[in-house]
């Protein structure tokens, strides 16, 4: 499907990397033509009155574990990078090609190729062929690659192909089957735990190897003070190192696990309050490049178990936008930075022409009421599962309209 006629959205607050300005946006043939205070509708255009609400780029969610269109559309997500942890894993060109074609036209799914066969961390997968099939990056999946030789070869190969390597940063030798972070809370609850330093050790090694290989490294979730310090130092040295985080890790600490509620069983596990505060500081100072939903819907068969036995993961697509807009209201970041974190930066890492309101880019647009109040209710969620750690929490910020390539989507 293609856009039938030009679309002009008037009376909008346009969110661009330079700030938020009043104006209009016009698009045709799936691309943004012009935006600004002097843009006006032309004869034959479809016209939408934004009535002073935010017009922002559709979100680009980097690192989801399931394709969940209703949840994505509710949350303003028009593109999602799918992790290779599927059944079967995305370790063959045919599987990557199938995923790259799925979802269109109302959602573009960008597959992340499995770094190793079966995601077992031993033998490199057919990365170049998977890139040809549509892979936009390489990912280690839910686990860290323990073998440094394999990891170095992966990074060298990725550097030749100019593909970003997306890593999970926990030293598996330390984490084992841990369900919590070592500390007072885990001890009191009697949960199997691993030291927070497992993250810093993994990050330090991967940064050293990425520097050696000259590769682009994206650490999908950084959640500790030491981890942020390592990324900050790597950036200061000019390395192509970026990092992300999910809302749970900057809004919740390990205190949220005190009632054994398995919806707070995450990977990495929730950290101490000091690390949560460090996450907010890292978002504010630019150390964090991406905020993603970490969307990983888990049904009752995975969550209605003892805490240590439950599968980690949260359904995050529907709450991502509201949680990030909360950072704006709390004056941690300005509005334009919120959409750099959730749209522009992930689009650049993936190399896709989206994530920003600019002429010539895809008309992936979200009309947003940043102040609209609502209650997160897992019983009413659009996701394929309701495992949100934010159930019954108040939120602000809802999508009023969504367009993918200029085509209106139902929200």
What annotation goes with each model-predicted range?
Residues 92-109, 156-167, 319-323:
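Alpha-helix-loop-beta-strand connector modules within alpha/beta enzyme cores
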Residues 12, 362-411:
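C-terminal cap of metal-dependent C-N hydrolases
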Residues 75-95, 102-123:
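Metal-cofactor-binding active-site regions of metalloenzymes
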Residues 12, 25, 30, 52, ...:
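Divalent metal-coordination and catalytic microenvironments
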Residues 188-216, 285, 290-291, 296-370:
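His/Asp/Glu-enriched, well-ordered alpha-helical/loop segment
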Residues 122-291:
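Histidine/acidic residue-rich metal-binding segments in metalloenzymes
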Residues 1-42, 407:
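N-terminal metal-binding scaffold of metallo-dependent hydrolase/deaminase domains
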